[in-house]
From Swiss-Prot:
One of its GO terms (biological process) is 'de novo' IMP biosynthetic process. The active site is at C1138 (nucleophile), H1263, E1265. It catalyses: N(2)-formyl-N(1)-(5-phospho-beta-D-ribosyl)glycinamide + L-glutamine + ATP + H2O = 2-formamido-N(1)-(5-O-phospho-beta-D-ribosyl)acetamidine + L-glutamate + ADP + phosphate + H(+). Monomer. Its main location: cytoplasm. This is Phosphoribosylformylglycinamidine synthase. Its EC number is 6.3.5.3. SUPFAM superfamilies: Class I glutamine amidotransferase-like, FGAM synthase PurL, linker domain, PurM C-terminal domain-like, PurM N-terminal domain-like, PurS-like. It comes from Pseudomonas fluorescens (strain Pf0-1). Residues 1045-1298 form the Glutamine amidotransferase type-1 domain. One of its GO terms (molecular function) is phosphoribosylformylglycinamidine synthase activity.
Length: 1298
């Protein structure tokens, strides 16, 4: 084993944060130093050259001075017997660099902690420094040799029920954490007595996972008695009723990993499977919809819990039909009170929590980062979501109880696209290869299906922790590339059947796969790729290692499938084959036995149906009279409540422009304020049709009226999605996610009544279907606090997500008030018809109350009329701005509109209030509704249209936007409230700032928060030195000559399709080239005029962002010669964007005239930054930027490591004077800046793009390829037609070639 010291592992900011955390736990800690430690398992002595290559490989990241360590060593390493994702990628890179003697590289962190502390304190320090699920802590470097020792497999265990009867199974139930019900234990005892043998632990574990509440949805399929009366339908039956009543537009419901609905026809853009040339195929582009929850893991370990939640939902989409493509994501969180230190709110009453779960604040710091990190690295934009906190003591017929979300809701959802011929699963022919695609088995997430089906606190802490999985998104990206290559083959798609691997691991996925295909299966346990050879059979079969899919591939298609996997470097293994008889057999060649041998019907067959007998219980509520509240103080409290406050801290960490198909993200207008009602994507690059998704949830209402909370969730989904241009209401399809504390007094009946209200009444009345959903039935947390039993139970919670095809993405409405459209009016549409019910409103909550009467959808006809009128007005161009009314009421709606429009408001309540006692209720009630901005001369006609639709009593003109930055509210000539917009916006942004300050670099958070005080910020703007609507490449395109450009990707790159689309539109033939093609000699770069290295996360940023990719080119002789030859040709051009920019900067020794280029390292904010930034094009030789110098315009940025680090101040100065700086960040006033967030990564002198001296090679961190169409921009100028300013860059390259 070789030991190689690495660079310091912590930035100054992370170092001081960790030191503070350690000294809080152990006050004796006085100092800390941390550096990476690398370990290499080698098969022979390395030569001098090989040692040099290895040393260069392991020098990565920012240049931080190395110290001589002092203090006690805590060496944190991956758990012995496991291979970390870092190791498998770094070892791949080493092999690609020709280091054949390196068996394996592994990395740890050596923490040196100074101070005098006891062994107990040392243990506390170790607990802070490592993740006990995947890591261990050692005391010296030599002990790391254990990383490379190979454990012997553990044997199978039989449970003696033939001898020990039922008692033996009861004991195993507890020891293995199986969560089997009494009737299931009886069922298994009978089944194995019938088979005349004892079950093995692997069979019981498999049965428990496959039949857990999590997988089988027993409550939703149960029969019911309520108050002694038998109910006709199951919960699932009532949901299916929506489909039975209105199935049009639904292509797949209830039977696959996601639902499929009809989409628009467009030119689907992808590479031809034979020629690898990108092009558009005109066909129906159908829409996948899916929303999952990952509540239990997120409570225990928020980052991996939320990350694997997103990963699992992405796999559900990819594994729909015969393979599909995820497109855009959403995330939601509901937690208990945050209690931010130093920012505690008056309504937050501390109640405590159990040790085993994380507090609400830490869930909201770590969980969103996990979800965003997975989506970012996979390459899926996160475009909408919600965030709510709720925790309150309420009065019930049994006394007071605390209701809240100690067990959080973590929602991960999204939409994708699928080809028409792949919607239905294919046939599994006998003899089909049964394949596992993706990562290896590891001992993580064991028993997750069963664990998430229990109330938090009823299983042991170790079992809880063991049930959380760990993530490797770059592996999932590789799997998706394989799936993409397969569906792109059309009728030659080798995948006949596919499922994702989720709860229960392969023990659930493989039986489900063969059973759904009406087959049996014979499997060999030792064929499963395994990074933890010491596992017992049940651990190999049931672990929930992530990023895996199971597939059936026909024998004739297998070689083609294998070639695809090898090109994409995606691991796969043939684990078994399909059999005609429905028997499940798992053999074990190591021990020479059959761990599983049972009929499928024993596993998946007639396990007993659950019956629930429950009673209804009254909701008591409490008295809440808002009429005497101080309006100013109420506004501040409401604006601080997380459900109302800015969600900026959740949004800027998530890439929102990847794919180049995003037409509407959360950030609105020139000031990029996070208030959008709906997310919208384009169907493809050649059309204006698209897809929309929006959410609705009003969970606290369920404590007063559960059915009302369900109806309001659907109502809010409709008022949100109405901002997009949808042809008819019935085009909207819903996902329903149900959360309940089953068994808690009254909750089962509330769940039943709400499902009935939604499934049997409201949805059929609206003509809307719910083709997909999920349930989580154990939403309670129990613990003992110094002898006192405590429980926190969630309200019955329905989260609704709406999806729909969009007729015109250019007509999406936003809340941004327009001050450039003359005199305008604000009109309130109040679907509550003046009832102003205040129950469970944010205003009630921030005063510690619940109220009595919940808002509700009283008449489905009103909602239908509202939707139709809004769509008509939008189609006719009458609506300048639109925002729904929701949490925080009318006041929040209009303030958010003013924040987005950077303007003031003059509101007059005379038309809606009869007395001053009603004012608070009018401003803060959360009845359904919306506010629209219209031109004043059109107001009478618009009011008449509402009247004609039967909504005349619902509409009132309530005021106008004004230019002076003041928000004034009057009634009967008296001022009710006045305040400055910028100060109110700071109140609204403060909760987000407080969390950002704790999570990221506090200096950056403060700069962004203080920037809100700037009254004269002009926002995003455009100043061009050329005509955006002129196509300078048109003459060359007309000649029909299309030069070839190589669109280069490495494993983990995810931005290649939109890059190809931009070059294709500029008149190039874009060709898909994988690094594996170059390393294998399948592709010759001499055939190309251009080469473009795309964005993403090559090798998951292992060995530095873009550095592993670059080094596999530098240190592989074939690749090095290919790249060097290409760069030296005078007729070639090269572009590197984002990850491609980082990669190219590390190839500068091969690129003539690039000696000034910097190295790109971690952003100054220490965070992934996804924003729209202003840049200025500099005077340079870049062939891409000719004729653009001096232009200032917005561009998409999305990166974690974009800070340009030069070797010295002198090198920076030299680069600056060389004429090689091509692009700089500027602020909204047009000045070059280093200030955050205008300069999102803190690069010196705003440098974010450079070129070689002759201009043939250009690198940049921002993403022009995502914003070349006008509709791709989060904010766009009305002067742009089809093209955005960045299209010129690609056309410049086309002109240069000629």
């Amino acid at each position: 084993m070789l030991i190689l010291r690495g660079a310091p592992a912590l930035s100054a900011f992370r170092h001081s944060k960790l030191l503070e955390q350690l000294s809080q736990k152990v006050p004796a800690v006085s100092g800390l130093y941390a550096e990476f430690a690398h370990f290499a398992e080698v098969t022979g002595v390395l030569t001098g050259d090989e040692q040099q290559v290895l040393a260069r490989l392991l020098k990565y990241g920012p240049s931080v001075p190395v110290q001589e360590p002092t203090g006690r060593l805590f060496l944190v390493l991956p758990r012995f017997g496991t291979i970390s994702p870092w190791s498998s990628k770094a070892s791949d890179i080493a092999r690609n660099c020709g280091l054949s003697k390196i068996q394996r590289l592994e990395r740890g962190i050596a923490f040196y902690v100074a101070g005098q502390f006891s062994e107990t304190e040392a243990q506390q320090i170790a607990d802070v420094l490592h993740d006990r699920m995947t890591q261990i802590v050692l005391a010296n470097l030599e002990q790391a040799a254990g990383l490379f020792s190979h454990a012997e497999p553990k044997p199978l265990t039989a449970i003696d029920i033939l001898g020990g009867g039922r008692a033996a199974l009861e004991k195993a139930n507890v020891e293995l954490g199986l969560a089997l019900a009494e009737d299931e234990i009886d069922y298994l005892v009978n089944a194995f007595n019938g088979l005349k043998r004892n079950p093995h632990d692997i069979e019981l574990m498999m049965f428990a996972q496959a039949n857990s509440e999590h997988c089988r949805h027993k409550i939703f399929n149960a029969s019911w008695d309520i108050d002694g009366e038998s109910q006709e339908k199951s919960l699932f039956g009532m949901i299916k009723n929506t489909y039975q009543m209105h199935s049009e537009g639904v292509l797949s419901a209830y039977k696959d990993n996601a639902s499929v609905i009809v989409g628009n026809v467009a030119g689907r853009f992808f590479p031809d499977p034979e020629t690898r040339q990108y092009g558009a195929v005109q066909e129906p582009v159908h829409i996948l919809m899916k929303v999952e929850t990952h509540n239990h893991p997120t409570a225990i370990a928020p980052f991996p819990g939320a990350s694997t939640g997103s990963g699992g939902e992405i796999r559900d989409e990819g594994a729909t039909g015969r393979g599909a493509k995820p497109k855009a994501g959403l995330t939601g969180f509901t937690v208990s009170n945050l209690q931010i230190p130093g920012f505690e709110q008056p309504w937050e009453v501390p109640y405590g929590k159990p040790e085993r779960i994380v507090n609400a604040l830490d869930i909201m710091i770590e969980g969103p980062l996990g979800g965003a990190a997975f989506n970012n690295e996979f390459g899926r934009p996160a475009l909408t979501g919600y965030f709510r906190t709720f925790e309150q003591s309420i009065t019930t017929p049994h006394g007071d109880e605390v209701r809240g979300y100690h067990k959080p809701i973590m929602l991960a959802g999204g939409m994708g696209n699928i080809r028409e011929e792949h919607v239905k699963k294919g046939e599994i022919v006998v003899g089909s290869k049964l394949v596992v695609l993706g990562g290896p088995a590891m001992l993580i997430g064991l028993g997750g299906g069963a664990a998430s089906s229990m109330a938090t606190g009823t299983s042991s802490a170790d079992l809880d922790f063991a049930s959380v999985q760990r993530e490797n998104p770059e592996m999932e990206r590789r799997c998706q590339e394989v799936i993409d290559r397969c569906w792109q083959l059309g009728d030659k798609n080798p995948i006949s059947f596919i499922h994702d691997v989720g709860a229960g691991g392969l023990s659930n996925a493989f039986p489900e796969l063969v059973n759904d295909g009406d087959r049996g299966g014979r499997f060999e346990l030792r064929n499963i790729p395994n990074d933890e050879p010491g596992m017992a059979p049940h651990e190999i079969w049931s672990n929930e290692s992530q990023e895996r899919y199971v597939l059936a591939v026909g024998p004739a298609d297998f070689e083609r499938f294998k070639a695809i996997c090898e090109r994409e470097r995606c691991p796969f293994a043939v684990v078994g084959e399909a059999t005609a008889e429905p028997q499940l057999t798992v053999t074990d060649s190591h021990f020479g036995n059959n761990p599983v041998d049972m009929p499928l019907e024993v596993l998946l067959g007639k396990a007993p149906r659950m019956h629930r007998s429950v009673v209804r219980e009254a909701e008591l509520g409490d008295d809440f009279d808002p009429s005497n509240l101080d309006i100013g103080e109420s506004i501040e409290r409401v604006l601080h409540h997380p459900a109302v406050a800015s969600k900026s801290f959740l949004i800027t960490i998530g890439d929102r422009t990847i794919t180049g198909l995003v037409a509407r993200d959360q950030m609105v207008g020139p000031w990029q304020v996070p208030v959008a009602d709906v997310a919208v994507t384009a169907t493809s690059f050649d059309v204006y049709t698209g897809e929309a998704m929006a959410m609705g949830e009003r969970t606290p209402l369920a404590l007063l009226d559960a059915p009302a909370s369900g109806r309001m969730a659907i109502g809010e989904t409709i008022t949100n999605i109405a901002a997009s241009r949808i042809n008819k209401l019935s085009d909207i399809k819903l996902s329903a996610n149900w959360m309940s504390a089953a068994g808690h007094p009254g909750e089962d009946a509330r769940l039943y009544d709400t499902v009935k209200a939604v499934g049997m009444e409201l949805c059929p009345e609206l003509g809307i279907t719910i083709p997909v959903g999920k349930d989580s039935m154990s939403m309670a947390t129990r613990w003992n606090d110094n002898g006192e039993d405590k429980t926190v139970t969630s309200p019955m919670s329905l989260i609704v997500t709406g999806f729909a095809p969009v007729a015109d993405i250019r007509q999406t409405l936003t809340p941004e008030l327009r001050m450039d459209k003359g005199t305008t009016d604000l009109i309130l549409i109040d679907l509550g018809r003046g009832q102003n019910r205040m129950g469970a409103s944010i205003l009630a909550q921030v005063h510690g109350k619940l109220g009595k009467q919940a808002p509700d959808v009283d008449d489905a006809e009103d909602l239908k009329a509202f939707f139709a009128v809004i769509q008509g007005l939008n189609a006719d161009g009458h609506l300048l701005a639109y925002h729904d009314r929701s949490d925080g009421g009318l006041l929040t709606s209009v303030m958010e509109m003013a924040f987005a429009g950077h303007c003031g408001l003059s509101l007059n309540l005379d038309s809606v209030a009869e007395s001053s006692a009603e004012i608070a209720a009018i401003l803060f009630n959360e009845e359904l509704g919306a506010v629209i901005q219209v031109r004043q001369d059109a107001t009478p006609d618009i009011l008449a249209q509402f009247s004609a639709a039967g909504l005349g009593d619902c509409v009132s003109v309530i005021g106008q936007p004004i230019n002076n930055g003041q928000i004034n509210i009057t009634f009967n000539g008296d001022t009710v409230f006045e305040g400055q917009r910028r100060l109110l916006q700071r109140q609204w942004a403060e909760t987000s700032y407080q969390i950002q300050r704790l999570r990221d670099n506090a200096d950056c958070a403060e700069q962004e928060f203080d920037a809100l005080l700037e009254e004269d910020n002009p926002g995003l703007s455009v100043k061009l030195s050329y005509d955006v609507n002129q196509d300078i490449a048109a003459p060359y395109i007309k000649k029909g000559i299309r030069p070839q450009v190589a669109v280069l990707r490495e494993q983990g790159v995810n931005g290649q399709v939109e890059m190809a689309a931009a070059f294709d539109r500029a008149g190039f033939n874009a060709i898909d080239v994988h690094m594996s093609d170059i390393l294998a000699g399948r592709v010759d770069l001499n055939e190309f005029k251009g080469l473009v290295a795309c964005g993403g996360f090559s090798y998951g940023d292992v060995l530095g962002a873009g550095e592993g990719w670059a080094k596999s080119a530098l240190f592989n002789s074939r690749a090095r010669d290919a790249f060097q030859g290409f760069f030296e040709r005078n007729d070639s051009f090269t572009l590197g964007v984002c990850n491609g920019c980082q990669m190219m900067s590390n190839l500068h020794e091969l690129i003539p005239g690039s000696e000034f280029w910097p190295h790109f390292v971690r952003n100054r904010s220490e965070q992934f930054e996804a924003r729209v930034a202003m840049v200025q094009v500099q005077e340079s030789n870049s062939i891409f930027l000719q004729g653009m110098a001096g232009s200032r315009m917005p561009i998409a940025i999305a990166h974690g490591e974009g800070h340009a680090e030069f070797e010295s101040e002198e090198a920076l100065l030299e680069a600056d004077l060389s004429g090689c700086v091509a692009m700089r960040f500027v602020d909204n006033h047009g000045k070059v800046t280093e200030a955050y967030p205008a300069n999102p990564n803190g690069s010196p002198r705003g440098i974010t793009g450079l070129t070689s001296r002759d201009g043939r090679v250009t690198i940049m961190m921002p993403h022009p390829e995502r914003v070349f169409r006008a509709v791709q921009n989060s904010w766009r100028s009305e002067d742009w037609n089809e093209d955005a300013p960045w299209m010129r860059m690609f056309r410049n390259a086309r002109v240069w070639v000629n």
